[in-house]
């Protein structure tokens, strides 16, 4: 089954320096994490702090969700971390 992203929530994790968001596959919730470096790479004007990274995520949500779906289809795991190389 394909992933869906019905929950627009996202949050910044300062300990892991990433933005966290969730996808759904049927009744399963799958957590995803996008590294700060990846967000700064796809949004060059992003600042590497919480407001800047959340804004970069919001501006590139469709692109990030597409990458998440592509990675999920290849490998099924409990959670996923997206790096710069994953978001094309």
What are these regions (language model features)?
Residues 19-45:
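A short, structured beta-strand/loop element
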Residues 3, 10, 30, 37-40, ...:
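Flexible, active-site-adjacent loop/turn segments at secondary-structure boundaries
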Residues 17, 29, 62-64:
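A generic signature of intrinsically disordered, low-complexity regions enriched in glycine/proline
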């Amino acid at each position: 089954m394909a992933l869906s992203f019905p929950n627009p929530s996202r949050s910044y994790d300062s300990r892991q320096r990433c933005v966290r968001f969730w996808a759904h596959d049927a009744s399963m919730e799958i957590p995803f994490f996008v590294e700060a470096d990846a967000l700064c790479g796809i949004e060059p004007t992003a600042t590497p702090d919480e407001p800047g990274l959340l804004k970069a995520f919001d501006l590139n949500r469709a692109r990030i969700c597409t990458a998440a779906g592509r990675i999920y289809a290849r490998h099924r795991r409990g959670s996923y971390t997206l790096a710069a190389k994953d978001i094309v």
